[in-house]
Amino acid sequence: MKRKITLISVTAVLLVCAVCIEKFCQLPVWQLLIIYLVPYLLIGFGTLKEAAEGIFEGDLFNEDFLMSIATIGALCIGFLPGAETEFPEAVFVMLFFQIGELFEEYAEGKSRDSISHLLAIRPDVANVERDGKVSEVSPEDVAIGEIIVVKPGERVPIDGKVIEGETSLDTAALTGESLPRDISVGDSIMSGCINLSGVVRVKTTKVFGESTVSKIIDLVESADKNKSKSESFITKFARVYTPVVVMAALTLAFIPPVFAGAGFMASFPIWLHRALIFLVVSCPCALVISVPLSFFGGLGAASRRGVLIKGSNYVDALANLGVVVFDKTGTLTYGKFEVEAVHPDDFDEHELLHLAAHVEHFSTHPIGAALRNAFPAEAVDGCEVTNVEEIAGRGVRAEAAGRTVCVGNSKMMDDLGVEWHDCHLAGTIVHVAVDGKYAGHIVISDVVKKDSAEAVRGLKRLGVERTVMLTGDREAVGKEVAEKLGLDEYHAGLLPADKVAQVERLISEKPAGKVLAFVGDGINDAPVLKRADVGIAMGGLGSDAAIEAADVVLMDDKPSKIAEAVRISRRTIGIARQNVWFAIGVKVSILALATVGFGTMWMAVFADVGVTVLAVFNAMRALSAR
């Protein structure tokens, strides 16, 4: 870019000198041509070379070709009888063309910088423990199960589990969140994050190629391959448009003089001048550059907020969102169970929870984890539990504190012949029997995410007409969550195949021109994510399925970012449309003026380079989309 700035500056100085020489020195036309050829070739050699190479490679009709024939024509027109020289105009057109390209390069660089911060998350080395020594190796050379050491300030190279130490992680490059994430022994650690404080030893759970950082880099690098409808149209349009423009210019130059009353040679310079203006004005740079640049800026703006969109075609889709379907667990809720209520039956409440937590101490079921978390670990350790038996589809039976305790569902109570009581609360009901008598029940519920309600409200404000929740939970649970969040409808008790069927039904019912998005956690939702018009995966940090199956990946667990992605997409589409209509409007106006003789080469320069620069700056607004 520095070289181009120098070239433009030197050309501008030489052009001013040439204009002064022409004004104050009465020189023959051929000498003036030589003087003007110096700045012309200095600034235009690259364009002329590209045009020539395009001719030999079969890419005849491009902007370099248009600029070349227009400026060469302007240089030659002065040698025609009765025509005025247009040497300064020829150099000015080429100079401003290069200035326009300079602004384009700058804007494209800014747009790419907005995404390149994600490519910078790739780690260079991994510190691996081998034979009692720590050595630096390439992340690609680390196998699953090896121990790596991550020091403060270093980027985590590979996914794994912390086996020693505790620290805070900076996940801003992935999620857009400024708050650090605390981790300790037993926690998963994702590649691409920066270790902020303590030294941690990590046991790798994936090879580098399958780690989060590799998946994200692959996603970002391929994002510009999926073009939007607008981009695809502009690309096809330019292929047809440019040859048509050249033919129209030739027609304008040669046909009117044939029918002119003054004779062909007398009127040919006038119409040739108009044809050259026509060529300069018709250059499609503003459209070909600014529209893709708008979408690239939108992708960058979204990525900075932790929303990875796999291509600008999905920006198009998000802008037309009409129906949003949510999976419940892990999407609108945390997918972590907590004890909501304890209802004893002629039994002490504390004792009921105490015994249930003891019996579930060795269970791997999420309900067991919720019960253990609800009771202090030291109390659990102080009680002897024997003869633990986990009964599939029923619950757990064990001896605790000299009593036979059964913790499970209503089917377990029926098998024991124990009369149990139903509960008016929604959630998972865990019944407890002690020594063959009903002791009460515990209500365990999935916790709704803090910003789930705001996510639904945000989508409503943006005009999304229908919000739906699908869940495999009971009817009562689904109803409670749907009412709490203000969803339009819900469907409970669904198997994975049922969810696909529901999405297909909703797609058939959606309004024409609208898009249906399915939002899931990416763990067991791959079939539905693929079936929806747009698949949005929550919590991309650590979910391979999310990155593989979805079209849009939210790198954290905030469903409210869906509305943010929609806002960015709509703003991006709006900016692209502004550029299209502005460029077409100005060009058509000046083309009309040029055809009837009121256009000038300076107007043509503005219609081409000026419009391109303005469109590029407008496209850069997509980078700051909110």
Q: Where do the model's predicted regions map?
A:
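Membrane-water interface of transmembrane alpha-helices in multipass transporters/channels
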Residues: 26-37, 61-68, 82-93, 233, ...
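Membrane-embedded alpha-helical bundles of multi-pass transporters
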Residues: 20-27, 50-59, 72-83, 301, ...
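Juxtamembrane helix-loop transition segments at the membrane interface in multi-pass membrane proteins
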Residues: 52-62, 103-117, 293-312, 620-626
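Conserved cytosolic catalytic loops of P-type ATPases
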Residues: 117-210, 313-356, 399-400
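Juxtamembrane coupling segments of multi-pass membrane pumps/enzymes
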Residues: 92-152, 183, 309, 477, ...
